[in-house]
Amino acid sequence: MITPNVRRFLNLLCGEYSNQQQAFDNPPLYAHIFLRYRSLPQLKPGSILLEQTYAVDPKNPYRLRMIRAEEQPSGAIKLWNHTFQDPARFAGATFDPALRRSIQTPDLISLDQCHYQVVEQSDGYHGAMEPGCQCIVRRDGKDTVLVSSFHLQGESLQTLDRGHDPITNERCWGSVAGPFRFKRTQSWAADLASAWL
């Protein structure tokens, strides 16, 4: 069972998103990326699969995560972030129902210190790393602290991920030109209709 607040959020989130227009308008600054969010009803309530791929290589995700949405006493939604023991095994699972159904809890690794907090405001849902989180991302042989946020409103999803030096706070990687701007190209909210009732 999930709360009405979480179900409303997931109904809006679940689908495929593309930043095609942004990538075409600014090819040096933005790669063309797909984000795909699909429910995983065999796991704990609120569990969804996130697959991120480059448009030029849609079958090989560069990021695969399981995120579990859970309402907190404050009314905010916590997104528990997990990676996979063997990500390659589940590559393409957003397109493959049998492969999605095969994902089980032992396949997952909790990314402690990398969970998100989502708050609904008048202009949609705003998510960011939980206060006090120190999510370490290793990039180019160096540990960096992830600073990540998103804004979901209607068919629009904006994301901004940057890695900072843990000592100097200097930006080491991530967008220099502002957030990635995605539009939903298809909704998979229907998948949620019978999930976690």
UniProtKB/Swiss-Prot annotation:
Keywords: Lyase. InterPro entries: CpcT/CpeT, CpcT/CpeT_sf. GO terms for molecular function: lyase activity. Its EC number is 4.-.-.-. It holds the Pfam family CpeT. Coiled coil: none annotated. It comes from the Bacteria. The keyword Aminoacyl-tRNA synthetase does not apply. Covalently attaches a chromophore to Cys residue(s) of phycobiliproteins. Belongs to the CpcT/CpeT biliprotein lyase family. This is Chromophore lyase CpcT/CpeT. It comes from Synechococcus sp. (strain WH8103).
